[in-house]
Amino acid sequence: MLRSADCGSLRDENAGDHVTLAGWVGRRRDHGGIIFLDLRDRSGAVQVVFNPETDADATRVAEEVRGEWVVQVKGTVNRRPEGSENPAMATGDVEVMVTEITVLNRSLTPPFYIEEDAEADESLRLRYRYLDLRRPPMLRNLTLRHHVVKYIRDFLSDRDFLEIETPILIKSTPEGARDFLVPSRMQPGNFYALPQSPQQMKQLLMVSGIERYFQIARCFRDEDLRADRQLEFTQLDLEMSFVEEDDILDLTEELYIGMIESVTPDKKLRKPFPRITHAEAMERYASDKPDIRFGLEMTDVSELASETEFRVFLSTMEGGGQIKGFVVPGQAGFVTGQMKDLDDTAKASGAGGLAHIRYRGTNPVGQLSENEILQSAGLRMPAEWHRRLADKMGAGPGDMILLMAGRQPRLNVWLSAMRTHVSELLELTDPDELAFAFVTKFPLFDWNEDAKRWDSSHHPFTSPEDGQEGELDGENLGDIKSKAYDLVCNGSELASGSIRIHNRQLQEKIFAILGHSKEEVESRFGPILEAFEYGAPPHGGIAPGIDRLVAILCGSPSIRDVIAFPKTQSGTDLLFEAPTPVDPKQLEELSLRITEKPD
């Protein structure tokens, strides 16, 4: 070995030890001929010292050393002189007096500083990702990711799950997003697809009698990117036979609580995880992935709004819309600039605007004077009306009420955006708090207004609620609930799952409602339908995203910070310069030809 100890492992109790270290040179300081270097490896950094009076040869070499050179040093661990300790370093009580140094490799001047906070554009960091990953925060992120995955594997293995790998090259059966297609050289004109998820394969494993399966699965979706999406991503894929919904949720909660308390014990974890229905989440939070760290819960005030002469409210309700909003406690003192910010936020989300009421007095709302009730222009109502509004919404003197008008589902989108904005404006959330919740009983179908058809709310293999199978022949398909569930945390969806259909006739009926012809169904889903006729057991599962979970645990706004080699939002790999054109000979072998896309 080229080293006997890790740089970040040295402590006061190591004083007097003779050590050999190896790593990268960080900060350099010269003081009166004495050279101080921070030597860094994956474990951390330690100060190494070169004194020309005791080790002239080593000091001469150190004079040439520059940042990010790779060196090996030998020396003795000493306690730092009193007053020179560095509490910002884990090794700040000690230093290594060097007697010998060997340059293992030199380095060009890096395009950005390799330190805690790199003041560099993200595109530059991605272009030199191998340098970016040397920075302590990136190393911490990847280390945490490793511990998360290891905990998952150990947890499930201890509970009799089998880790089974499913194919990467599969048949194209689009699940909502576009497939990545892979041409077959041996069968010209035919294509494989990269899996968007191992959905059918894990269900077939249940038919196979595996009973408890998991894998850390790579998934691929050709979709537009954003901060929490990548073209390729990693999820825990988990499936169980002979279970009901609560069995899956109980296991998932146990997994998450144990994992978080093990790998990030400093996080403030709310437990147990509440379970709320989709309808309740939309009613209370205007979102199916609510952040429950704070209140600001919704109230439908359409009935009271109908008593006003406010044209916006009345025209909205005449068109089948609602008036909903929430109370912002203690914020009646918002000034004109702050109110304009709220109105701009409403319009940016797609809403026409925002109605507000501020109760600035100290008396009960019903006793406030006209001058103490600040209302949006056009909304002029007497104190008695405000008393009833305040009673319904739970508002009081000193509070502000925000109201929005519109038709669903857009109204909830606007309200959710406003709720999030207000929480950020008032700093209502603790970044170290993790507030998980299960959202259950999603609709089985969503109406696609553009295509004039029903789509699966989750995916077509989701089972309807018990007792609602007969309603599949009716006209109120939007009222049918499913055995689908999501795990959400701090306003993000972390996992999605369901109890699956395991009966061919029911599965074919779902496909028919979704508009798939019998020929299409047989072509795309024939194997799993046939398998259902050979004793398929009741089964269900869940698929937590690894990238998003680790990003939340790390406090990162982007999953790119927890993936070793991510793509940009345009799907470009800046390090390897992918995608790129390929050699025409490769296209010829695949029987492919590039054609110009018509305007």
Predicted regions and their residues:
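Class II aminoacyl-tRNA synthetase catalytic cores and aaRS-like
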Residues: M1-D599
